[in-house]
């Protein structure tokens, strides 16, 4: 399943595996002036390639190595012969078949390994200049692209919403917050967040600050309960009413416990 919408000079390409006629989980790529940012999951490769036949990219950037962001890389390279760029730490991960949990295989599938190049500090298209900013936290290799004159920030998965209930095991909230503060401090007239889940936030700077406040407040509450002798499970029950249902569906890869443990490590 694929949906194409326009935002200013950008095409947003939302993709999802279809089950029972409904999308299972949306992910978004963006095409702007020939630059394709992320390439979706394995179940939507054919539909994406069909769209790109009449909208050919001139280069690709992967925001990070996760399977729902890189699956069409190999096919794009074979068809168009163009360069694909990613963070240095992502290169060996994108170049091999990594093991997936059952939920990942069902929702996104295995991407074919592909050869990508280390991304430079600046990506130039005919009309735009994109600054590459390292934003670890969601993953160690995460990057975003910022076009300062337009106020666009292609933010990948580093920001989802101003409140959250679960995170992945590999995520580090202290590092994530540092990355988001770096973005919020950018000297731009506006900061529009174009996320990999497909949501576009016009007032991105305020959204980032709201999320920062949410995490700081959550960390303070969790630490107070810890000092009162609460276990992680008891903290979860007090602050969230218990574990999120997504934990049992994802082998505890997405869980409230991960979030609580991460904020308890914040200084």
Please give the residue ranges for each predicted region:
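Active-site neighborhood of phospho(di)ester-bond hydrolases with catalytic His/Asp-centered motifs
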Residues: 37-40, 58-66, 84-88, 134-137, ...
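Short, flexible loop segments at the rims of nucleotide/cofactor-binding pockets, characterized by
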Residues: 13-19, 36-40, 60-63, 129-134, ...
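Conserved beta-strand hairpin/beta-sheet module of binuclear metal-dependent hydrolase folds
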Residues: 1-55, 144-156
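Accessory terminal helices/loops
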Residues: 1, 185-190, 199-267
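Conserved beta-strand segments of alpha/beta enzyme cores
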Residues: 9-11, 83, 129-131, 192
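Metallo-beta-lactamase
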Residues: 4-5, 89-134, 139-224, ...
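Active-site HxH/HxHxD metal-binding segment of metal-dependent hydrolases
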Residues: 46-125
